[in-house]
Each structure stands twice: as C-alpha cells, then as structure tokens.
C-alpha cells in the first residue's frame, strides 16, 4: 500500500492531485473565488485546556454542510471519537488529528469506511510512525489516505508553535504514492509565517496546502493568531499557484 520498506508496494498515481485547502471562520464564497478546492472546519475541537472552546459539535457539521451546499466545495472535518462516525455521513474527507494519529482502534474502523482520510502526523511522530498509521487504515481496506505534515514538537517554542518539517514532503513522495498535504498554520502558529512556509511547501512539491482563515482573527474563538483573513488568503493563494505553474512549466 505504501512502499516495499513498509511491506506494501502500490504504484498508482496519487488519487487527489493538486489540492488547495481553506480553513474556517470565513465567507466560503470568498475562499472558493481565491482558488480553494476544499473547505475545512473543526466541528469537534481537540484543545489542550478543557476550558478552551471545544467546537460546536453536531451543529458545526450542519454549518459545514450549509457551506458545502452554497459553494459546491467538498468539506473536511476532524473525527475525535469513533462513536461520532455516523454524524460524518455527508462529510467528504475525515481528518485524523495529530493527537489521534496512533489511535489504532480508530484507524482500523476508518479503514472499513470508503471515505478519504486526511491523516495528520503526530505531535512528535517519526515518518515511519506516520506511515505505519496509514498502513492501519489501508490494511483494513481503505486506500484513500492523504498524509499531512503539520509541524512537530522540537526544543523551539518561543518563535514558532511547532517546527515545520518540509523535508518530509519529498521523502514521503519518494516512499509512497499517497498525496502529501502541508499545514503551515498549525506548524508555525503565527499568521505572518504562514505565507512564506506555504510557498516553501508548494516549492517542495506538496499536493495540497491547508491554511486557517477567519474574518476577524483577533476575535476568533481558537487559532486566531495563525489565521489569515480572506483577503490575505487570496493574496497567498495567488503566489502559491504561480509557484506551481513555474514548477510545471
């Protein structure tokens, strides 16, 4: 399913080429106009503190479905508890967050579904651990896996939220046939760092880029510090597309 090194070898083309991702807390029509191919929003939010905003739950999924209907864009949201899987029937892509990357029982159950799975790298996960988590899903029957680099925990925490490991993009693309997405928002934790790292991810060959958005970042209930405005996103997306055009030309 992934490579000879990991006991599988599937040489199919990536099933989701050319992805570009929008975040949440924004006008979805603006994001679509800027070039986003998917909308992602957190209905269930994994937070370090139990006192922080935990998401809207089932109501959040309903709002995502409204955005899907309005724009025609497929939606992505995170599953935190396998017992909530029935609520995700109309969700197009299920995200497995960094905290659940090695929740093997969940991965096995997701392997029994037919939905694409966006699998984030663990907080301090190695490349091999990420690939083994992908194998859990694929060995259970679901080969629609998308790998996501979202930054790993290192000794640096003063100036960045995590450390974005861009080398993982060519490494994973060399080892696997699976699409590789980069999340510079969670990796850096700061809006002013998102654009340069998104551009670097595009240059490294990422198949998709996930960017957090909000109409009013200072007043966002979560992740405001790393969120771009829709206008900033449109500017950044334009640069990303030009990089990809230059690489393809």
Segment roles from a protein language model:
Residues 12-26, 50-54, 74-78, 97-99, ...:
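Active-site mouth loops of central-metabolism enzymes
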Residues 43, 47, 100-167:
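Conserved anion-binding
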Residues 35, 87-95, 111-117, 138-144, ...:
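Glycine-enriched alpha-helix->loop->beta-strand junction motifs that scaffold or abut catalytic
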Residues 31, 39, 88, 119, ...:
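Conserved, mostly hydrophobic/aromatic
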Residues 40-59, 214-227:
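Glycine-rich, proline-tolerant flexible connector loops at the mouths of alpha/beta enzymes
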Residues 12-20, 37-41, 75-77, 94-96, ...:
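Hydrophobic faces of well-ordered beta-strands that scaffold small-molecule active sites
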Residues 53-77, 109-116, 166-181, 226-249:
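Alpha-helix-loop-beta-strand connector modules within alpha/beta enzyme cores
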Residues 1-26, 238, 245-249:
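N-terminal amphipathic alpha-helix/helix-capping segment at the start of soluble metabolic enzymes
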């Amino acid at each position: 399913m992934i490579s000879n090194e990991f006991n599988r070898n599937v040489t199919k083309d990536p099933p989701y080429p050319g992805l570009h991702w929008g975040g949440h807390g924004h006008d979805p029509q603006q994001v679509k106009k800027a070039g986003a191919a998917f909308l992602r929003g957190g209905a269930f939010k994994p937070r370090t503190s139990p006192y922080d905003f935990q998401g809207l739950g089932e109501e959040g999924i309903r709002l995502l479905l409204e955005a899907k209907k309005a724009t025609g864009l497929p939606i992505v949201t995170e599953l935190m508890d396998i017992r909530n899987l029935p609520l995700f029937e109309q969700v197009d892509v299920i995200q497995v967050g960094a905290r659940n990357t090695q929740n093997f029982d969940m991965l096995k159950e997701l392997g029994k579904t037919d939905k694409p799975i966006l699998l984030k790298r663990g907080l301090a996960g190695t490349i091999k651990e990420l690939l083994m988590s992908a194998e859990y899903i694929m060995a259970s029957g679901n080969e629609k896996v998308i790998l996501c680099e979202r930054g790993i925990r290192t000794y640096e925490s003063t100036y960045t939220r995590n450390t974005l490991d861009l080398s993982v993009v060519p490494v994973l693309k060399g080892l696997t046939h699976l699409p590789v997405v980069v999340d510079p928002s969670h990796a850096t934790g700061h809006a002013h760092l998102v654009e340069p790292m998104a551009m670097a991810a595009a240059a490294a060959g990422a198949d998709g880029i996930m960017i957090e958005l909000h109409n009013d970042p200072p007043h966002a209930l979560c992740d405001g510090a790393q969120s771009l405005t829709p206008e900033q996103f449109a500017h950044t997306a334009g640069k990303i597309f030009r990089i990809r055009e230059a690489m393809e030309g």
